[in-house]
Amino acid sequence: MSVLVQFRVKVPDVERFRAAAAKFEPVIAGLGGSNHRAFVSESDPNEVATLSEWDSHDAMMAATDRFGDDFNREAGTEGLEWETRIWHEL
């Protein structure tokens, strides 16, 4: 059964994050992620989140091991504290 993965982080540059999220969308899709979208918080203009579906938590971990460092460099999120939540359909 697939999982919905939520990543959340406060960023110094939302536009830079948005550009990286768009650039890496095909990479994520190529590694098995689907419905990848990025969002900004209504209550905090520097808080962003991404949501994407994966076949499993392990599949997401294997994929992010391959592109995560490059994404963080592009997005300006190196060294920032990310919150990760894995959601299972009821």
What are these model-predicted stretches?
Residues 17-20, 55-66:
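Short amphipathic alpha-helices within nucleic acid-binding modules
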Residues 18-30:
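Short amphipathic alpha-helix segments
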Residues 1-10:
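Short glycine-/aliphatic-rich beta-strand segments at the starts of folded cytosolic domains
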